[in-house]
A protein has these predicted regions:
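Generic secondary-structure microfeatures
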Residues: 14-16, 56, 60
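Short N-terminal mixed-charge amphipathic segments
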Residues: 1-51
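Short, hydrophobic/amphipathic alpha-helical patches that form generic packing surfaces
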Residues: 47-58, 99-103
Length: 134
């Protein structure tokens, strides 16, 4: 996925290390299971900068790299993301950004094959249960 931030084009790619060490999957799952609209909006606003930062690690760690276990270093990079998003959101939509980032994570990362296999298993299980109850 390509994204232009402050006039510079970046490639977003969710690599294994950055995704796992920052516990992105749990945070995305929490977003998708929010109880109400206000809670979902709050979680989306909190997740956007971190999701963007993690997606930038694969190809742009020279500019946005950080040690996920060093809170001060991560917070410094998060501050950059907040500033970038302030500018980005003047002309773009937060919901679309989050949807595109999550789609990139699901469709074009190391997870995509695993997710497709899991969906296939689920469909087979449902089909078997449906057939068994007839």
């Amino acid at each position: 996925m390509k994204i232009t931030l402050n006039g510079t084009e970046y490639t977003i790619k969710f690599g294994y290390e950055a995704t796992v060490k920052n516990k992105i999957l749990k945070k995305v799952a929490d977003l998708e299971t929010s109880a109400d609209d206000l809670e979902a909006l709050d979680k989306m606003l909190m997740l956007a900068p971190e999701l963007l930062l993690v997606g930038l690690q694969k190809f742009h760690s020279d500019t946005f790299g950080f040690d996920p276990y060093n809170e001060a270093e991560k917070e410094q990079r998060m501050e950059q993301m907040y500033a970038i998003l302030d500018d980005y959101l003047e002309e773009n939509d937060m919901t679309s950004l989050i949807q595109n980032l999550i789609k990139e994570l699901e469709d074009n990362s190391f997870l995509s094959r695993m997710l497709r296999q899991e969906q296939s298993k689920t469909k087979k299980t449902v089909a078997m249960k449906t057939t068994a109850t007839k």
